[in-house]
Swiss-Prot record:
GO terms for molecular function: ATP binding; ATP hydrolysis activity; DNA replication origin binding; lipid binding. The keyword Nucleotide-binding applies. This is Chromosomal replication initiator protein DnaA. Oligomerizes as a right-handed, spiral filament on DNA at oriC. Plays an essential role in the initiation and regulation of chromosomal replication. ATP-DnaA binds to the origin of replication (oriC) to initiate formation of the DNA replication initiation complex once per cell cycle. Binds the DnaA box (a 9 base pair repeat at the origin) and separates the double-stranded (ds)DNA. Forms a right-handed helical filament on oriC DNA; dsDNA binds to the exterior of the filament while single-stranded (ss)DNA is stabiized in the filament's interior. Disulfide bonds: none annotated. Domain I is involved in oligomerization and binding regulators, domain II is flexibile and of varying length in different bacteria, domain III forms the AAA+ region, while domain IV binds dsDNA. The lineage of its organism: Bacteria, Pseudomonadati, Pseudomonadota, Alphaproteobacteria, Hyphomicrobiales. Residues 132-354 are annotated as: Domain III, AAA+ region.
Length: 475
């Protein structure tokens, strides 16, 4: 790509950001790249089939108009998926896997391509009863906001699919902190997916998966367990961070591979991204990262207010006289910032106090009842990728330079500063930091940390730079 094309692309992105707004741009366009400009066509790419489909369906004309404002001669936008476009030709696959992927591309009729990996047996095994589902956790009760737009759209896409449809992204991996809505989305997928009766959607916690596998081994029914699991249309796994044990992880990996290769959908949730699941085998992490990985961010005040109103409406369905005044809702939304469960707990407390004491809800009552839920603002969670990006921009190098093996002075110092910040601003271990910096050994990270620690004590310029970087990352 030429410099002039890159400059044009930057202006188009700025125009697109202004047109759709910051939230929409971040959700759908932040990972879109320019590949080439040829004659009257512009070739763009995105990392997943889901993003490609969504942009084509909802924003194609807008992207084209932004390009035409920059280059009037452009009349066509070609959007492709980077992973499919840039990967080397794979080795010859087993027939089932090949046919399943043809179905994803639309090269063959889906009905002819969704052959199961094994002949499914009756789903009578204890583990296939699934984990309990909460009837309240549906799409209808899920409140959508800036923090969860992409995760909700992806989950809805899975739930609305039909048997025989090509799988757009696999697996769908959703990660977030406690109480931000992961389980709600996964159970909503399960409820909606099973509603039509056409597909079998199974929801399991990682703990239930482990229990089922161990029980099957003890009862010598492991083969039935495996066959039944691999006959599922959509497998939904919650709290993957709790998956332990080499044999259990190996079986999970085999199940994951078998379902994906057969064109079956897998949806997974955990409290961290795949790369941070250090207890999992590298093969599992790699497979998880190959799908659509979506983070659900912390709840903004508007979203917290929406959740509170939703919970009040749900409570009013059973207690018609229950009401929470707007000033009380505003106070709760401002004050309870930790997670959605605390918000629901606050409404439950107000309901109980109001009903048991036959008193209306007031601001004074709310302040008394939820005092323990009002917590100090948590510090911003800083990611190693954010550190690399900010440091690279500060020292005018690229992120790939920081991850490379280059040893030139203009790269070594920024890399050491980034490693130092990763150690001081995150909870990541030295081996994990080294792995995020191009697979370096933990001793290299330790050397960098000690080097910068020594220098900031005597080099005021470097100390000022490091402190400025910390402020940027923490703001």
């Amino acid at each position: 790509m030429t410099n002039s094309e890159q400059e044009r692309w930057s202006r188009v992105k700025g125009r697109l950001r202004s047109t759709v707004g910051e939230d929409v741009y971040t959700s759908w366009f932040a990972r879109m790249d320019l590949e080439a400009v040829q004659d009257e066509s512009v070739h763009l790419s995105v990392p997943t089939r889901f993003l490609k489909s969504w942009i084509q369906a909802h924003y194609a004309e807008r992207v084209l108009s932004c390009w035409q404002a920059e280059m009037p001669e452009v009349h066509r936008i070609d959007l492709s998926v980077r992973t499919a476009m840039r990967c080397a030709t794979p080795a010859k696959e087993a027939p089932v896997a090949v046919e399943a992927r043809r179905a994803e591309r639309g090269d063959a009729k889906p009905a002819d391509t969704r052959a199961p990996v094994m002949t499914p047996v009756a789903a009578s095994h204890d583990a296939l009863g699934g984990s309990p589902l909460d009837p309240r956790l549906t799409f209808a009760s899920f409140v959508v906001g800036r923090a969860n737009t992409l995760a909700h759209a992806a989950a809805r896409q899975v739930a609305d699919g039909r048997r025989g449809d090509p799988v757009m992204f696999n697996p769908l991996y959703i990660h977030a902190g406690v109480g931000l809505g992961k389980t709600h989305l996964l159970q909503a997928v399960t409820w909606a997916g099973n509603a039509g009766g056409e597909r079998k959607v199974l929801y399991l916690t990682a703990e239930k998966f482990m229990y089922g596998f161990v029980a099957a081994l003890k009862s010598q029914t492991a083969l039935a367990f495996k066959e039944a699991l691999r006959g599922i249309d959509v497998l939904v796994i919650d709290d993957l961070q709790f998956l332990q044990g080499k044999s259990t992880q190996a079986e999970f990996c085999h199940t994951l591979n078998a379902l994906i290769d057969a064109g079956r959908q897998v949806v997974i949730a955990a409290d961290r991204p795949p790369s941070d699941l250090e207890s999992l085998d590298d093969r599992v992490r790699s497979r998880l990262a190959g799908g659509l990985v979506v983070e659900m961010a912390t709840l903004g005040e508007d979203l917290r207010l929406g959740i509170l109103k939703s919970r009040v409406a749900a409570a009013r369905a059973h207690h018609a006289s229950f009401d929470v005044p707007e000033p009380v809702l505003d106070y709760l939304a401002r004050s309870i910032t930790h997670n959605g469960r605390d918000l629901e707990g606050a409404i439950n407390r107000l309901l109980a106090h109001s009903k048991l004491n036959n008193q209306p809800v007031t601001l004074d009552m709310a302040e008394r009842e939820v005092r323990d839920l009002v917590r100090p603002q948590e510090p911003k969670r800083i990611k190693i990728e954010d550190i690399q990006r900010v440091v690279a921009r500060q020292y005018n190098v690229s992120r790939s330079d920081l991850l490379s093996s280059r040893r030139t002075a203009n790269v070594v110092r920024p890399r050491q500063v980034a490693m130092y910040l990763a150690k001081t601003l995150t909870l990541r271990s030295l081996p994990e930091i080294g792995r995020r910096f191009g697979g370096r050994d933990h001793t290299t990270v330790l050397h960098a940390v000690r080097k910068i620690e020594a220098l900031v004590g005597k080099d005021t310029t470097l100390n000022d730079e490091v402190e400025a970087l910390k402020r940027q990352l923490q703001d």
